[in-house]
């Protein structure tokens, strides 16, 4: 039907559940290669941005234009984990850490994740949180941070594009 996609090893997706470090029930999406074998160990990329599990039935066209395209990664033998984050006001980095690490550990415990090959990726707000996470745990062997606010001191006086409001309001809440 679509010969241009004949060589794509399509992904399947599973809704997964775990608890955060402080016991809050969480969920996320786990994309697996079409030829997934639970007896084998796979490298895994963790990509997050607030709440992504609502995209359970979203179609991902194979494309290099996304930060992390689950179809492209799964077609190349990777697992892709999109965990939801439970935020505590004033602690965005710690909230992401306490949501993501237990989720990754729960998947590693299932036996098919190569714990020596887990990477994390984040863009913008997710990039900031990824930068925070990699300073707090040795769990991730690689990280991709796209357009993160990695220096809040220099960004403090910046202006938000959408609202025209100073960034200080984000950091002072």
Predicted stretch roles:
Residues 24, 42-44, 79:
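Hydrophobic core residues within well-ordered beta-strands of beta-rich domains
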Residues 40-42, 116-117:
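Short coil/turn segments at beta-strand junctions that form active-site/ligand-binding loops
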Residues 1-40, 68:
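Non-catalytic accessory segments flanking enzyme active sites
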